[in-house]
């Protein structure tokens, strides 16, 4: 489904939070949304890959990577795993790599930067915990909606039909 965050903010101004504008769309799908699964990790993609291997229909993986711009948490292999398992998208408060390949994969990927260096794969991190970045706190099972204009957060799904 396509989302227009500007229109959603107009319709649901009193019930959404707006994430500070620091994210860039790197994926093949610029607009995406759904219920979030949260991850908190730092320069380690192991827990991310494990989460993406689970069914993600209607979900968005939201990663608090500490804002690191030294190592990429998401690459084309991770995006392909997300697509294969039905995830709507990935929002990463951290970096990605292989940006030309990411553009070819039909999954949403928003991140703050790109860098060619990959993160470790030790599996260190937490899943389904509250995370805070971009001026908002994200709780597991909240809902996010993203497009090239921005990212918004709602505690409940928005009636956009």
Curated annotation (Swiss-Prot):
One matching Pfam family is RraA-like
- Please give the start and end residues of each transmembrane region: none
Query: Key word Lipid metabolism present in the record?
Result: no
Major localisation: cytoplasm
Q: Which GO terms describe its biological process?
A: regulation of RNA metabolic process
- The keyword Manganese appears for this protein: no
- GO cellular-component terms in the record? cytoplasm
GO molecular function, a single term: enzyme binding
| InterPro entries according to UniProt | RraA, RraA/RraA-like, RraA/RraA-like_sf, RraA_gpbac
Q: Which UniProt keywords apply?
A: Cytoplasm
Q: Where in the cell is it found?
A: Cytoplasm
Family designation: Belongs to the RraA family.
Which function does this protein serve? Globally modulates RNA abundance by binding to RNase E (Rne) and regulating its endonucleolytic activity. Can modulate Rne action in a substrate-dependent manner by altering the composition of the degradosome. Modulates RNA-binding and helicase activities of the degradosome.
On subunit structure and binding partners, the annotation says: Homotrimer. Binds to both RNA-binding sites in the C-terminal region of Rne and to RhlB.
Q: What is this protein called?
A: Regulator of ribonuclease activity A
Corresponding gene?
rraA
